Amino acid sequence: GALLCPFLIAAAGRVSTGLALLVLAALGVIVWLIYLTTPMDGQGSTRSKTGKEKIDWSFLHSVQFWLLTGLLFCQNAAEQSVTGWMVTYFKGSGIITGALAAYTVTVMWGATLVARLLIAFVFPFKQPRKAMVVMGVGCTIFYFFLMQAHTQGAAILLLFAFAFAMAGMNPTAVASAGKMTSVTSMGIMLPAASSGAILMPWIIGRVAERAGLAMGMACNIVPCIGLVLFAILVARMPEEN
C-alpha cells in the first residue's frame, strides 16, 4: 500500500485535488472497516472463576518487553523522520529536484518490500536477535552517509540501502516478544513505540527552525544509535518463553 499509494494519489491528483483527497479518505474508511470487523477476543486473557475474562498484565514486569518497546520507539522515530522530512530536505538542498523528489517514499517502501520478502521466503533469520544488531548498525551507517550525499544518484541509492536495512527491524522486534504478544501487550507496546514517530519529526522541525534543516536531519542519527543500543541489550538477555 505504501509503495503504490503515491502513484495512485498522483494519478488522482492529475484529475483534481479534490479527487486525490477523496481517494485518501476512502482508503481511510477501508482501514477503519478492517479494524471494525477484526475479531480480537480472548487473546492475552484468562477466565476467572466468575466466568469473566482476566487480563494478564505480567508482561509489564518484563525488562525484555520494555527494551523491545524502546527499540521500536527508536525505529519509528528514525523511519518516520526520514519519511516525513526527507523530501523537504532533498528539495531544499537541491540534491534531488523535480518529480523524483516526490517519490522518495516509494523508493523507501520499495526497498522495505523487497527486504521483507527476502527475509520471509529466501533468507529467514536463524538468530533474529543478532540480526537486529546488524540491522541497527546498518541503519546508522547508511543514514550517516545519506547525510553526506551531494548527488541525486548517491542520495537515492543510500536511501534505498537505509530502508533495506530498516525493513526487518519492526517485525523481528515484535516477533521477539514471543508469548508476551497479546492484544493487551500490543495495545501498550505499539502506541508507546509509535510516539517516537510523533516526537522525533517534531524535534527535527524545532531544530530546523533554529539551526537549519540539515542540522535537524542530523539529529535523526540519535534514534539510529538508539536502535543499536537497544538491539544489543535485547541480544544479551535470556530468551523469555
Where is each model-derived feature located?
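A late C-terminal transmembrane helix in Major Facilitator Superfamily
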Residues: M180-L213, M217-N220
